[in-house]
Structure formats: C-alpha cells, structure tokens
Amino acid sequence: MKVLITGGAGNIGSRLAASLIRRGDQVVVLDVNSEPLYPTPEFSKADICPGGVDDRELVMATVAEARPDSIFHLAAILSGGAEKDPDRTWRVNLEGTRNVLEAAVAAGVNRVVFTSTIATYGAGVPEPVNEHTPQWPSGLYGATKVAGERLGVYYHLRHGLDFRGVRLGAMVAPDAPVGGAASAFVCELYAQAVQCGAYRFDVYPTTQLPVVWVDDVVHALVGLHDADGEMLRHRVYNIAAGTPSVQAMADAVVRRIPDVKIDFVPDPVRAPIVDSWPSAMDVSASHDDWGWRPAFDLEQMTEQVLHELRERDAEPGRYI
C-alpha cells in the first residue's frame, strides 16, 4: 500500500511513518519540516516532499504524482499557536484540509484519515463526552477541527470519499508538539524533569483532562484505517486512555524523580483553554467497532516517556 502523510515529520506523523514502513507500506511525507521529530531508520526510507497543506497547487500536484491509496491528514496549527496567528490557522487548518480532500478526490484516493481533538467539544457538555456529544468549541483550534470533520463528512456524502478520523485527548510524548499546543505541558513536564530537574505548569493542579500515549495514537490511526468499514458506526472516534488531574501527572513524575521541583503558575490564556475541554472521554465505541484499546495508562506512559528521554540523553545525536 502507498500512503501519504501530511504533517508526517511531526510528533505523531514521524512515528506513524515508521510504523507503516515497518509493515511494508510505501510512505510519502508532506511537511514544512523535512527532519522528523522522532528519527528512526525506517523514516529515512520515506519520500519527503517539503511544503505546507495551505499551498493548494503543491498539495494537488503532490497527491496527483504520488497516487497514494490512502492519506493520513495530520498537518495543523495547534491550539496555542492558533490563538497567536488566526489567519495562518485558517489557511492551514481549514483551507489546507479542503486542499487535501480536493486532491484526494481528484486523484482517486480511497481513504483519508484525519486527526481531530478533544478541543472540539468545548465546555458545559455532559461528560464523559462520546461520539454523539454536541461540539461547541471555545477556541479557534477546536473550531477549525470541527469544520475539518464536517468537511470530511461532506466529501464522503458528496464524493464517496472514505473519510475517517480520531478525536484525541492530550497526547503524551517525549517532545512537545510543534506549533504550540495548549496541552503541551503534558509533554514538557517529562522533558524538563529529566533535563532540568524542575517544571512550572501553566495550568491549575486540579485540571483534569484525558491523556493518551503517542504510540497508542499511532495504533489507533492504523487500526481505524484498516478497519472494515461495515463495522464503523461513526466517521470520527474518541481516543484517550484515562483522565488524570495535572497534579496526578506531577505526582507520577515525582515518584520516579523524587528531587524534581514542580510548581504551578496558571497562564491567563492557556489555562482557560484547557479548562474549557471535557475532563473525560468515552472511548468504548473505538473498542466496540474496531477493537482499539490503549496499551498505556498514566503510570505506564510515565515510565515509557522517561525511558525514552533517558535513552535519548545516552545516545547523543540520535535526536535532532
């Protein structure tokens, strides 16, 4: 199978590319960054096309030339970056998504898999949120992702494109996502604890939010892509692995690095964005329809992310 990944050099994309190449797929990466955030021997086998999804001509030409069987559309400006640069966010998240969908239809691509977010739900909705919960986001990032979901459904209804997507909880990984996610603290905590011995949260310790380990996200994307369409009741599915408080995340690190110094100074912009998101996601549909389950809970993902960070420090030059 031949696959194109937009945002394929990013946190999720670089691991997804490696996973697909490992199983024998041919991968084309379209990304403004040519160097992967998570380098692997497998990623070096991907074909790299530098550029952004907001460049319509480039997207149309890249998809037409590559003729992929499927597209994983991951490229986006994230929540924190969206509030700082609304115009670019509109171009990348809205026009970019439309460019990808148009290119897919024009080139006869079979399937597009899209990454959405818990930020699409907003505040004041019944919890835990499920696939039927109304989406009333309070931030621009969430608003653009709702629009992206609905565009995908439109292209499914209008053009027969097999559009599928995942709504992700806050993703835990060794590197904070490029582009300024409001939830970047769930990654920064671990890196700063290992490298600096201290971390200052910009949200409240009582804040609760669904989290998910990056490799569980990759497994979800591949699993949803490969799933029998006849078994799918939804176009977009919730993906998360638990709902710890920020204090619980900090405590999990302190248990492993007892001398780490952690404090809390909530940011007046970021903290309200994060607090507007639901504190719990119902992911039962993902399990019931296509068998996805998270392999990592909070304790396991804490162990894994600290292991990867220490391994990185032990191998200079492995990470760029």
Give the role of each language-model region.
Residues 3-22:
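N-terminal Rossmann NAD(P)H-binding glycine-rich loop of SDR-like oxidoreductase domains
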Residues 53-92:
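NAD(P)H-binding glycine-rich loop region in Rossmannoid oxidoreductase-like domains
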Residues 83, 168-178, 188-212, 216:
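A conserved pocket-lining segment of Rossmann-fold NAD(P)-dependent short-chain dehydrogenase/reductase
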Residues 98-140:
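Conserved Rossmann-fold NAD(P)-dependent oxidoreductase catalytic core, especially the SDR/UDP-sugar
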Residues 116-117, 149-175:
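Conserved beta-loop-beta element that borders a ligand/cofactor-binding pocket
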Residues 122, 139-140, 164-183:
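Flexible, glycine-rich beta-alpha linker
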Residues 146, 159, 172-187, 214-215, ...:
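Glycine/proline-rich active-site loop of Rossmann-fold NAD(P)-dependent oxidoreductases
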Residues 202-205, 209-320:
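C-terminal substrate-binding subdomain of Rossmann-fold SDR/epimerase-dehydratase oxidoreductases
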